[in-house]
Design a protein with these regions (language model features):
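Glycine-/charge-enriched secondary-structure boundary and capping motifs
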Residues: 2-12, 23-26, 107-131, 139-143, ...
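A generic local secondary-structure boundary/capping motif
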Residues: 39-41, 49-52, 87-90, 122, ...
Length: 342
């Protein structure tokens, strides 16, 4: 079987395949709003999933995510795609309950490749403590895979992405740069060490970061995916606050900055920059570092907003778990931009 043919890497694999945020905002604004007192979180905001109240003690989190391959190994692709889809449940403050496969695959190609993808995905659902209970498949010229995931949470304890409080510290739980690393690896522009670090990061469930963080007073949370670090951080401000970012403290895969310095960036990063025009102000931040902050991430880390007096202890717990986390900034009174990067 020709795995490389089946797993042909498209121009935009992983979360780089997302539609531009500006386009999505315009389209979603044309959808009728559904009014239901039990719908706690819908699509009227840019949260990571929907939350629907079933009883006084139980609400469900509903989310889905799928994309085209960003790696040639089908088993690894399955694990990354599943980890990415499962992440939204943790970003909403819940635990994974059940998942369904979403499959697009050419029927004339080797089913063993699809079996490897599904095995990788199933292992991640199992690691998350969830149950994989079926799915849906269609014949397609291009391979795509992901999950529809249902999580559970107490109706009073779900997380939003836009409920930061003044004085909060923001923590990032994975290094940035996987978008540029994956895009350039196919052209031989990336060191193997950086590539392996990107693969490890994308396969790591955000379950562990969330479980550590849930012991603290989390005010807001989200995960970093296709809209990049700054795009998702912008959603956290809700246009009410300004988040001051110290760029020198942000962790990234070393090779990503080198790629940016050589102008080997991604189209998705440029779309993110265009969308954030007027919302982000850079102060003496090198262009290459700006690109790292705008880079679309696949299965990226969590952004957690916590009280300043709890940040140090949370960082200790994350470090004890060997999660490459960092404090990236703080929530301040509203200034002339949603985000100011120093």
């Amino acid at each position: 079987m020709d795995i490389k043919k089946i797993m042909k890497l498209p121009a935009c694999g992983g979360c780089m395949a997302k539609l531009p945020p500006g386009m999505l905002k315009d389209v979603v604004s044309q959808i009728p709003v559904f009014n239901d007192p039990n719908l706690l979180v819908g699509f009227d905001t840019s949260d990571d999933g929907a939350v629907y109240k079933l009883s006084d003690d139980i609400a469900i989190i509903q989310t889905l995510d799928f994309f085209t391959p960003m790696v040639e190994d089908p088993y690894t692709f399955g694990k990354i795609a599943a980890a990415n889809a499962l992440s939204d449940v943790y970003a909403m403050g819940g635990r994974v309950a059940v998942a369904l496969n979403i499959v697009c695959f050419p029927e004339e190609d080797d089913p063993a490749v699809l079996a490897s993808i599904l095995r990788g995905g199933a292992e991640k659902v199992m690691e998350a403590g969830g149950v994989l209970c079926g799915g849906h498949s269609i014949n397609d010229r291009e391979c795509k895979y992901g999950l529809s995931v249902t999580g559970v949470v107490h109706p009073d304890k779900y997380l939003r992405n836009n409920t930061c409080k003044k004085g909060d510290v923001i923590i990032l739980t994975k290094p940035l740069g996987v978008g540029m690393i994956m895009a350039s690896y196919r052209y031989g522009e990336v060191a193997e060490e950086d590539y392996q670090q990107a693969l490890k990061s994308m396969q790591t469930l955000n379950k562990y970061a969330f479980e550590a963080a849930s012991k603290f007073h989390l005010h807001a949370g989200t995960d970093v995916t296709g809209f990049g670090f700054l795009g998702h951080l912008n959603e956290m401000t809700n246009d009410d606050y300004t988040i001051a970012v110290e760029s020198k403290g942000i962790k990234y895969i070393p090779g990503a900055l080198k790629l940016a310095q050589e102008f080997l960036t991604t189209g998705g990063g440029q779309k993110n920059r265009n969308f954030l025009k007027g919302k982000v102000r850079f102060q003496n931040v090198p262009d290459a570092m700006q690109e790292v902050l705008l880079d679309p991430q696949t299965s990226g880390g969590m952004l957690l907003s916590v009280p300043a007096n709890e940040a140090k202890e949370l960082m200790k717990e994350l470090n004890d778990l060997e999660l490459p986390s960092c404090i990236i900034g703080e929530v301040q009174e509203r200034q002339d931009a949603n985000i100011i990067v120093y």
